Design a protein with these regions (language model features):
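A short acidic, Gly/Pro-enriched loop at the edge of an enzyme's catalytic core
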Residues: 105-118
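Conserved Class I S-adenosyl-L-methionine
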Residues: 3, 52-54, 181-274
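Conserved alpha-helix/loop element of class I SAM-dependent methyltransferases that forms part
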Residues: 24-43, 58
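N-terminal, positively charged/glycine-rich alpha-helical extensions of SAM-dependent methyltransferases
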Residues: 1-18
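Conserved catalytic/acceptor-binding region of the Class I
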Residues: 131-132, 146-213
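Class I SAM-dependent methyltransferase SAM/SAH-binding core
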Residues: 44-107
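A short SAM/SAH-binding and catalytic strip from SAM-dependent methyltransferases
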Residues: 116-130, 153
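Short glycine-dipeptide loop
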Residues: 65-66, 141-146
Length: 274
């Protein structure tokens, strides 16, 4: 894999999305994740990859004034949106930090802290080594505390995983790592077990709440005017090759009309520290 700074790449991707991020399925899904966590008044919560504060604010309401929520995200743009929400809602039980969620031991604000619940919503697939991350996160749980984390179904959001395959074939970085979860819920369960967590339950939930047909041509344009996530593949010297490889990978998935019906499914794990 070509050298690049994965946390920086992710920061760039989400800085560009910050102002429009909430105009999507993300608010509904974040609320659902917090509901699954079953937070109680007085609990302490760590919200990793907190983004614009969607789950953070829901968690703040759930734990009430005697609880606390710490949000961590690499994207300054996303955190700016979250901070604006905190000011608008006058919340005093939340603190936010700009930092990589893969290196929490270097975040001084977390020194000595333990949490009743750790949330990571829609972000595990952004990590190059998610297993190592979950192992580290588990050390921040109180005894009996739980982690709530999700990965999308291998047949969901197929354009993204196709770009990832093209990136591997071109030896160029694409800042997501869904190929780590080819077995879906099985890989997620194993990751939690390897982190020493127990009482693991895996739920299958809807993400966008509708089936979706996707068309090849809708995504080839991402290489003509590349987003931050596809910028390496959209460079002029590689763009046409990347398009051909995308078409090749797409053909392995598509029907005779060149379309794919995606599976609207996310696997959510709830796993406890003994």
């Amino acid at each position: 894999m070509a050298l690049h700074d994965q946390p920086l790449d992710i920061g760039d991707v989400y800085n560009s999305r910050a102002e429009s991020y909430d105009n999507s399925w993300h608010p509904r899904f974040a609320r659902h994740m917090v509901e699954i966590a079953k937070l109680k008044p007085g609990e302490d919560v760590l919200d990793l990859a907190c983004g614009t504060g969607l789950a953070t604010l829901c968690a703040s309401t759930a734990v009430q004034e005697h609880g606390s929520v710490v949000g961590v995200d690499i994207s300054g743009g996303m955190l700016a949106q979250a901070k604006h929400k905190l000011q608008s809602h006058d919340l005093n039980n939340v603190e936010l930090h700009q930092h990589s969620i893969t290196d929490l031991d270097r975040l001084l604000a977390l020194n000595g802290k333990k949490f009743d619940a750790i949330l990571c919503c829609s972000a595990l697939v952004l990590l190059r080594d998610p297993g190592a991350a979950v192992k580290q996160w588990a050390t921040y749980l109180k005894p009996g505390g739980r982690i709530v984390v999700d990965v999308i179904h291998p047949r969901d959001q197929l354009p993204g995983i196709t770009f990832e395959k093209v990136g591997k074939r071109c030896n160029l970085p694409v800042p997501f790592y869904r190929l780590n979860f080819g077995a879906g819920s099985g890989d997620l369960r194993q990751m939690c077990e390897d982190a020493g967590l127990s009482r693991i339950s895996i739920l299958s939930v809807s993400q966008i709440d509708r089936p979706e047909l996707v068309d090849l041509n809708d995504f080839l344009t991402d290489l003509d005017a590349p987003r931050p996530s596809t910028r390496h593949l959209g460079r002029s010297q590689i763009r046409e090759e990347a398009k051909m490889l995308f078409k090749d990978e797409w053909a392995k998935l598509a029907d005779e009309q060149g379309k794919i019906k995606q599976v609207d499914c996310v696997f959510v794990a709830v796993a406890y520290r003994s």
